[in-house]
Amino acid sequence: MAPLTLATYDEIKEVRTTEAVVLSTAVSWGGLVIAGERSGVGKTTVTLALLTALAQKSSRVQSFKVGPDYIDPMFHRQATGRPCYNLDPILTSETYVQQCFAHRCQDAEFALVEGVMGLFDGASGLSDVASTAHIARLLNLPVLLVVDCSRLSRSVLAIIHGYRTLDPRVRVAGVVLNRVGSDRHLELLTDALASIDIPILGVLRRQGAIALPDRHLGLVPTAELPQIPNILTRLAHLGQTCFDWPVLTPLLASSSPSQLPICPPTYLLPHSPTPAPRIAIAQDAAFSFYYPDNLDILTTLGAELIPWSPLDNEQPPADIDGLYFGGGFPEVFAADLAANKKLRTELKMRLQDSLPTYAECGGLMYLADTLVDLEGQSWPMVGVLPTTVRMATRLTLGYRQAVVQQPNFLLAQEQTVWGHEFHRSCADTPAENPVYQLKRYGAAQPHDAEGWSLRQVHASYLHLHWGGCPEVAQAFVAACRQYRYRA
């Protein structure tokens, strides 16, 4: 893959504000979007069945996920052996989405994009911004629509006709009929669809053998599933036997349109020629929510990334200049994290000594004084943030426009970033001087303030994709480099 190009800060701003390329409808990107008529119709199962079957033919299968989700891409990576990249025009930009897709497909033989929710469901009820349809239009990709047929016969015609005609710019190339019962049920469905001449490119029967386990934040991550090889084997068989491959294969073949130059999605300042700062990345079953782009950006800026496990190690890696705690499920592993007292003590000492630290969501929970889990049990955590984090029944979810009210080593006063919240915990005691003032997508007024900034610790529930705010990553690496060479 070509190395990432570096540019000046003025060029960063110019690229991020450039409008997306409008592609001629005569030009087709290589690849296919898997969409659902709503959530829960089997979109992820279909996606994984196709990916695992393709991966048995080729080692160059590139997948993408629409939206900010972390867990579905973990399954993609298990299926293909390659990182799955998120396509999110709110967290990044339309231009970034196009460039990311083009760049990551350069060496791919097949490309597949898994959608989010229903085909036209996005960040607003007034438009389909950030929806699967939005991404399909940006990339000029055909759509394979997955329909749950478990309680349908002729009504399937109305559903598919509506999805095909709502937006003529979105090309529904075929459908997958999921959860089909008997042969008679399939006959009723195919008879109903005969009048609109829509290709039926897959039929999946009702079965529970390939159900993916889930819990309070969606699917259980792959790191907690020792049975994942068996699941993928069954999915591969499903993929090989339930789809019309002569029609699907050319749709999935990767290529790029000539109107859009293939260029890397990340434009960053050249990094210093001085030795790389070493940043420890907490990566285990408790902390696993990382966008691959974020890690790529840190590397591009000159950082050396050191993966490590707070669950398995009593000390952070030696000779480090920064810490990065992503989100995850510390509440599930609270007992193990609490039992590692030696590590908690060492981390508190290092963070109080101004070791640059970036913590999102689950990382914030770990740095708090106490974590109260789903059963109401209290567990001691690192104790850098003066608050108790408590699991709640209410899900906090959605895009946020965040305006900086308390500048720190990463963020400037009044700087605006877009992030995403997705958690079922809350802090009993809010930050005394919150980093961010938050506003929901499309809202006129702010609704909340949150985020901690203590010494060189930044901790927030907000998940950021640094493709949309590379200056944050730049500031983090600069702080780590400065820490390395402090007197």
Feature names for model-found ranges:
Residues 136, 287-300, 304-305, 394-487:
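C-terminal and late-domain segments of enzyme folds
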Residues 25-139, 147-174, 183-187:
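ATP-dependent carboxylate-amine ligase catalytic core
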Residues 153-271:
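Internal gly/pro-rich beta-alpha loop/helix module
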Residues 330-408:
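Cysteine-nucleophile active-site neighborhood
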Residues 277-341, 345-350:
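Phosphate-binding active sites in nucleotide-utilizing proteins
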Residues 3-14, 18-36:
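Extreme N-terminal, non-catalytic leader segments
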Residues 33, 112-114, 144, 176, ...:
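Structural motif
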Residues 222-275, 283-287, 449-487:
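Acyltransferase
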